């Protein structure tokens, strides 16, 4: 993308078969909500996650309500690897999920990139977006911690079939902004 974007990458090795990760991905609309107690909704408006498909994610992390709609811009998949890239409708966030088969199981990579890619005005707009308008939601450490937690949850899901305990929605929504 562009060096002015903020890019966060978290990766994890999981000693589970690639087929388990592939099955998890194939059922993403349902699995997204079960993946983390902070994930509230996932809608694949076209019923799939192919390039061009419309998607909505909603999660509440530390009282911040992230409700994002966008489009899958890339979707590659074969028997050893998958890569799915999502771009928000505002074109200020890109989320990439990538999985691959390894000798000991599978590898999962979760990348979140934020900012405008437009040359010249991109830097100014990023300043306005991150420092002025969405200062609270542009908490990079909070987002990174959530990504790390998501990876730990995925490890447990794929190795033990163990999902995290749900947090009641009213508790998550208390004081959410």
Question: Where does each model-flagged region fall?
Answer:
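Well-ordered beta-strand positions in beta-sheet-rich domains
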Residues: 9-11, 67-69, 94-96, 111
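Short amphipathic alpha-helical segments
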Residues: 17-24, 142-146, 150
């Amino acid at each position: 993308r562009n060096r002015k974007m903020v890019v966060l990458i978290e990766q994890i090795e999981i000693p589970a078969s690639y087929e388990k990760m592939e099955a998890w991905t194939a059922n993403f609309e349902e699995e997204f909500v079960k993946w983390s107690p902070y994930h509230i909704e996932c809608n694949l408006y076209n019923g799939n996650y192919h390039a061009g498909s419309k998607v909505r994610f909603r999660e509440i992390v530390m009282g911040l309500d992230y409700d994002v709609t966008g489009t899958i811009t890339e979707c590659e998949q074969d028997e050893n690897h998958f890569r799915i890239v999502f771009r928000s409708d505002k074109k200020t966030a890109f989320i990439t999920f990538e999985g691959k088969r390894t000798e000991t199981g599978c590898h999962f990579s979760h990348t979140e990139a934020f900012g405008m890619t437009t040359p010249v005005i991109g830097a100014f707009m990023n300043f306005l977006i991150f420092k002025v308008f969405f200062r609270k939601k542009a908490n990079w450490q909070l987002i990174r911690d959530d990504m790390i937690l998501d990876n730990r949850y995925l490890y447990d899901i794929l190795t033990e079939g163990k999902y995290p305990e749900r947090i009641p929605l009213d508790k998550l929504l208390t004081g959410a902004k």
